[in-house]
């Protein structure tokens, strides 16, 4: 009789059962044995002999558990760490070199690279608290660590010293979760001191995003002037207006005026003072005690005030914006009837987001951004039930994905143009039925109020509007009789309009924007054809020159600037409502078609602001 190859008897292996049904197809006589304690497998080899494999899955855990028991009972230990930290009592910890070396590259180098500690039974350790070392030794044996939240910084510092990366990451993740306006600067400084790059970056990003709240905390007032200058020089500070940065600096100086008044000039040069409004500067020059006592700083701000009010070209500083995506928003539009869509295009990945609809469908509206909020102004609701011109002003908050109504304009305005100066929205021209407006009104968001300002010299609907050097430009349009190539400029200090050089081409419904201190007018309708030509106005030479034409003819298009390039969206080519989006690169003077809208449309309101909160979008799209 052939002997049974399987073991028998009362031993542990008698608990194995052959599981032939689990053998993979083509495995021949392979047999899998399984138990609750281990996994074993027999497989054929290339030479016809079978191979037996066995794995005890929790062996490592069990082995380290036994080694930890040996450590606690001080058996088979081959090193004693004698830990001394400042005035704390010294402590001794017995351990196994191999376990310490497996957990920490520092211990590994200490015990294997021929250093003097390699042959020592007692090793002196300084610079780390005994309680911290105790927790790190426990982690080496148990892969588990526990501490009070007040001890996290100390443990993380020790883990960095001994290069125990897993503990460093765990502590870093915990501290990121604890970031708060009151502790973010302290955590950032700590991370920089110990060289934890990721935690330092996350803490700095938190400071930039919550700048307003951080500047009210004690840690902010303990910054050095160099640290403060570095902070306020960031492009990605999340502030609604530059006055927040100005006030933060003045308050920092007032905290210790005697010692800090010497730094005011350096701070003001880091503040983007040309982004402050003349009214704000005038008030500070009159009332700020810090400026009153420093003639150099006062003269510096007086010069900026004069440059702003005289509308002199200045060096263009990047707009401050948090490091979140900035998207191109399109509101409303027309395709067979007015639309209520709000969508956002991300040029970085080519995706579109569908967001909260306008409360009332509108086309011929205009879009703009103030303080990160998107405003939809005027337009008309063309519907099967009739056409209604709109005086509405609605505000969209990307953080809540919600619209809220604001005070309406004094009159409805369809095919309107808008621009923003000093945080105020200017609504220009447009029509109400057969009335073509030359009137202009200004909206103050802080007061939720509209006020009429000086009317344009010419009635204009389908007017393109842009702002450059705090001057409001109205370009082209239709006066009720003729399409226009004329353009005019509004001076807010004088409350008056002046004509400027006319365009080379008649354009109604053109897209108008500002890029690199020039005004661009793209497309439009000349009374006979939709246009693809584009021209640029140089305010220094007061001349219009043609640049490369768009690939498609289009009027009633949307236009905006994103990261130094012009984007035109949709419009009407005389036959079709376009869904194409083109991008202009001023460096190469070329247009390229970059994407398509989700559907063709004309008369959209377009503007650029921060990416919406995905959490709010997901919650509002949830149908559960």
Curated annotation (Swiss-Prot):
There is a cross-link at residue 135 (N5-[4-(S-L-cysteinyl)-5-methyl-1H-imidazol-2-yl]-L-ornithine (Arg-Cys) (interchain with C-151 in KEAP1)). The modification S-(2-succinyl)cysteine is found at residues 38, 151, 241, 288, 319, 613. The modification S-nitrosocysteine is found at residue 151. Keywords: Cytoplasm, Kelch repeat, Nucleus, Repeat, S-nitrosylation, Thioether bond, Ubl conjugation, Ubl conjugation pathway. There is a cross-link at residue 151 (N5-[4-(S-L-cysteinyl)-5-methyl-1H-imidazol-2-yl]-L-ornithine (Cys-Arg) (interchain with R-135 in KEAP1)). Ubiquitin ligase activity of the BCR(KEAP1) complex is inhibited by oxidative stress and electrophile metabolites such as sulforaphane. Electrophile metabolites react with reactive cysteine residues in KEAP1 and trigger non-enzymatic covalent modifications of these cysteine residues, leading to inactivate the ubiquitin ligase activity of the BCR(KEAP1) complex. Selective autophagy also inactivates the BCR(KEAP1) complex via interaction between KEAP1 and SQSTM1/p62, which sequesters the complex in inclusion bodies and promotes its degradation. Substrate-specific adapter of a BCR (BTB-CUL3-RBX1) E3 ubiquitin ligase complex that regulates the response to oxidative stress by targeting NFE2L2/NRF2 for ubiquitination. KEAP1 acts as a key sensor of oxidative and electrophilic stress: in normal conditions, the BCR(KEAP1) complex mediates ubiquitination and degradation of NFE2L2/NRF2, a transcription factor regulating expression of many cytoprotective genes. Belongs to the KEAP1 family. This is Kelch-like ECH-associated protein 1. It comes from Pongo abelii (Sumatran orangutan).
